[in-house]
Amino acid sequence: MDKKELVEKIALNTLVFETLGQPEKEREFTIQDLRRWGFDLILGKKNGVRTFFASQAGREVGDKWEEGGATYEIEEILLELPENKKLFAHIETSEGVAYIVAELREGKENLEILRTPAPTLLMAFFKKHRLHELANNLKSVGVITEFYKQRGRESLPLPYKKLPLVARDFLERAKKVEKMAGFGRVALAYFGKTREKDNRFRVSWLLPTIALFDIDISEKANTALEEFK
């Protein structure tokens, strides 16, 4: 079988498992989640106006700085969300770049407190919490994030009934993660084992980006990829 024919055979025999649904437009988070991302919720002044905003952790009360053409001053570092306010975040894209946008909400009023590139923050989040499988296998980040993992030489993929337990376990774990996230897609080509009994495979896994900023979901996704080896 030549290379072109093999590529075609792999495409035709890759197994696809989908948790169908519309990726959520936004997700509610806690102030603890914000800290896990590396930010504090601040009550202070932005361009001289008293308001709430997010600042990278490590700054102190009284600190003043300029960033992105705006001036900031910290009056208080909050330990809880302000009364009657909730924290929501969603993903926006501009010129091919995904941004995470966090807002404080009270009724119909939204106050944007954070807007930063999602790929950079997501990678920092994975590394900070030692989610090495997610960090090492991150492929691309938009509204949907792709992870891609490959082991060994490619050959004709095996059918589902011939998958070993380790591959089936991964699919089961992935399904549970996708139900938590509300959407997901796994494309798996399992090629068999090497002479040393190592698994040969390639897998692409799609998950909603905003859901990956939930530590519980990311930890379970990391475990799923980690155990598939």
Swiss-Prot record:
Between which residues do disulfide bridges form?
Answer: none
What's the family? Belongs to the UPF0128 family.
Q: Which domain of life is it from?
A: Bacteria
Name the record gives this protein: UPF0128 protein aq_756
Kindly give the InterPro entries that the UniProt entry links to this protein. Answer: UPF0128
- Entries under Pfam families matching the protein: UPF0128 (PF03673)
